[in-house]
Amino acid sequence: MQLRIYFNPAELTFIEPPEEDIYIVIDVMRATTTMTVMFEQGARQVLAAQTLEQALEAGRKVPGRILCGERHTQTPPGFDCGNSPAQFATMDLNNRELVLTTSNGTRALFACPEKSTRLAGCFYNGTAVTAKAIELAHEHQSNIAILCAAEYGYFALEDAACAGYLAQEILRQEPDIQIHDSTHGAITLYESYPPTILHEKAQSSLDLIATGQQKDLEYCLVRNKSVCVPMVTGIENATGLLQLVHPASQLIEI
């Protein structure tokens, strides 16, 4: 079993990423943290959209869905909610379906090979998501890849540091896994920039503070508070959106 880390979705365009790999997609601030909180609050399904138009159309097709979105940290016009884990932590989402589109995180999910297994990872569910990835890698006799969502195509410090943290967790649980240079680099970044320092250094963190959304950092920069692991299970035929569920839940088709 091997572990590779990609610091930007664009890296996947230069190779032929194996479809059989297990991909952990990271957007610490905030998409993958938010998805994890959504399932903690009882969500039945989260549908990930690449564009605002796709999300709005998916909301129109199925009344009752909660339309969630973010562009440049703000909630787009016409959306019910933004991309705030702190906001969703106060909501009862039991058996609800949510549509989510964000600047970086949901797009990164689409960047993975179409038929690949994709998990949403973050500091908040670090131990749980790595354990699930290892379980699936053994089950499918495949490797693990960690993909950082980055920020508008640029390197994101918090995603890379979280990749290092998840790599440490994988090595702790699976010490014989073969690692590559990218893993060494990510672990070194995490050791230099743990969450307590990311709070002050990561541009995404500074942007949230500047826009009065610092409450989200209490979720984005906290380790191992959740056992929820959002997982892509397919594509919704009517909308083309990625369907995510928490593996412990059962999705009943309507």
Task: Report residues per predicted region.
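Structural motif
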Residues: 3-4, 21-24, 44-46, 64-67, ...
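Glycine-rich anion-binding loop/nest that anchors nucleotide
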Residues: 122, 144-151, 174
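Charged, flexible boundary elements
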Residues: 1-11
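Long, charged alpha-helical interface segments
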Residues: 80-107, 111-117, 131, 157-254
